[in-house]
């Protein structure tokens, strides 16, 4: 499976989940990163919402969280970030197509 197919599959799965982490005016800090790591261990695919009062833009927040937690950015749209853990991303990319 190519990276684009893996991304498509993970985005399809993300439609069924609600955001579990919210980034507010405090931005990305150690507590937020710890929460993201815990959520990824439990769920392997999470949505993060960046609220309007956050000082940084969504793309910057996504890059900061991914760098601090070792996660992979699946998609960034509007104020929503979809993240997955590295292991899930690698396993999705290595799956064979059912063709």
Give the location of each predicted region.
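Positively charged, polar, low-complexity stretches
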Residues: 1-99
